[in-house]
Amino acid sequence: MSALGSPVRAYDFLLKFLLVGDSDVGKGEILASLQDGAAESPYGHPAGIDYKTTTILLDGRRVKLQLWDTSGQGRFCTIFRSYSRGAQGVILVYDIANRWSFDGIDRWIKEIDEHAPGVPKILVGNRLHLAFKRQVPTEQAQAYAERLGVTFFEVSPLCNFNITESFTELARIVLLRHGMDRLWRPSKVLSLQDLCCRAVVSCTPVHLVDKLPLPIALRSHLKSFSMANGLNARMMHGGSYSLTTSSTHKRSSLRKVKLVRPPQSPPKNCTRNSCKIS
């Protein structure tokens, strides 16, 4: 509770996502793999609708997700139309071991474009743990997602693989669309090798990397890392660049200035033989 007696919110943003797809693609399995959050809607919902909430961390901010799943059966199309209102993101789900579910994504996209046009979407291939029964090649699904202009994931609720990552990416897309680009920059967990490279190049100019007592392959990686991340930008181009620019400017200025010297008259008592230039 805050000082004024009002409850403190446990999240910074609240988003509503819809999981759409055929009835047997495992959308309920995805929701069941989420341990935290309520499994019942506070507003109540009819049969054929599954609901769950979960909270994710996105660049240090707490984002609460309301996840709604229609059964995917034809008789619930009316329910889908009503629950699609106000949705801020859509998760298109198919079963990688069921070709029919993948071919049905086009039908769901038409429904979404009709009742929730412009809502950000991602494509999710579910049940990756059944890869030995795969009927939808990863390359084909990836090409299909690129044609739609959406992000693609393959997930496994059984292994808890890519579930949170897919939700997090969709939340990032939604918040970026709503003008949160200043706060929601893509985050990256650096590997131990990247951390070591960052520590080295932060105190070593790139032109001195070749002189480090390291294997050639490692020196080459350090140089590439330095140029890619711009950590040596100041040492590479800072003082030397400004000095070169300044001196070049001065030389060009001198060339433009015409020196005018006052006329000099020879001394009165100076002759050709007696006058010497010191």
UniProtKB/Swiss-Prot annotation:
Q: Where is this region: Switch-II?
A: 72-88
Q: Which GO terms describe its cellular component?
A: endosome; nuclear envelope; perinuclear region of cytoplasm; plasma membrane; synaptic vesicle
Tell me what this protein is called: Ras-related protein Rab-40B
What range(s) does the SOCS box domain occupy? 175-228
Which residues lie in Polar residues bias regions? 267-278
The biological pathway it contributes to is:
Protein modification; protein ubiquitination
Please report the record's description of how this protein sits within the membrane: Lipid-anchor
The record's subcellular locations are:
Cell membrane; Cytoplasm, Cytosol; Cell projection, Lamellipodium membrane; Cell projection, Ruffle
Which keywords does this chain's UniProt record carry? Cell membrane, Cell projection, Cytoplasm, GTP-binding, Hydrolase, Lipoprotein, Magnesium, Membrane, Metal-binding, Nucleotide-binding, Palmitate, Prenylation, Ubl conjugation pathway
Organism of this sequence: Homo sapiens
- What the record says about its domains? The SOCS box contains two defined motifs including the BC box that recruits and binds Elongin BC complex, and the Cul box which interacts with the Cullin family of proteins to form a ECS (Elongin-Cullin-SOCS-box protein) E3 ubiquitin ligase complex. Switch I, switch II and the interswitch regions are characteristic of Rab GTPases and mediate the interactions with Rab downstream effectors. The switch regions undergo conformational changes upon nucleotide binding which drive interaction with specific sets of effector proteins, with most effectors only binding to GTP-bound Rab.
Give the region (Switch-I) as residue ranges.
Answer: 41-49
What is annotated about its quaternary structure and interactions? Answer: Component of the cullin-5-RING E3 ubiquitin-protein ligase complex (ECS(RAB40B) complex) composed of CUL5, Elongin BC (ELOB and ELOC), RNF7/RBX2 and RAB40B; RAB40B interaction with ECS complex is GTP-independent. Binds (GTP-bound) LIMA1; interaction promotes LIMA1 subcellular localization in lamellipodia during cell migration. Interacts (GTP-bound) with TKS5/SH3PXD2A (via PX domain); interaction promotes invadopodia-mediated extracellular matrix degradation.
Which InterPro entries does the protein's record reference?
P-loop_NTPase (IPR027417), Small_GTP-bd (IPR005225), Small_GTPase (IPR001806), Small_GTPase_Rab (IPR050305), SOCS_box (IPR001496), SOCS_box-like_dom_sf (IPR036036)
Name the lipidated positions (S-geranylgeranyl cysteine). 275
Q: Give the cofactors, semicolon-separated.
A: Mg(2+)
The biological process GO terms on file are: cellular detoxification; exocytosis; intracellular signal transduction; protein ubiquitination
Q: How is its activity regulated?
A: Regulated by guanine nucleotide exchange factors (GEFs) which promote the exchange of bound GDP for free GTP. Regulated by GTPase activating proteins (GAPs) which increase the GTP hydrolysis activity. Inhibited by GDP dissociation inhibitors (GDIs).
Broad class of where this protein is predominantly found: membrane
EC code(s) of this entry: 3.6.5.2
Purpose of the protein: RAB40B small GTPase acts as substrate-recognition components of the ECS(RAB40B) E3 ubiquitin ligase complex which mediates the ubiquitination of target proteins. The Rab40 subfamily belongs to the Rab family that are key regulators of intracellular membrane trafficking, from the formation of transport vesicles to their fusion with membranes. Rabs cycle between an inactive GDP-bound form and an active GTP-bound form that is able to recruit to membranes different sets of downstream effectors directly responsible for vesicle formation, movement, tethering and fusion.
Q: Which domain of life is it from?
A: Eukaryota
Gene name linked to the record? RAB40B
Protein residues bound to GTP: 23, 26-27, 72, 126-127
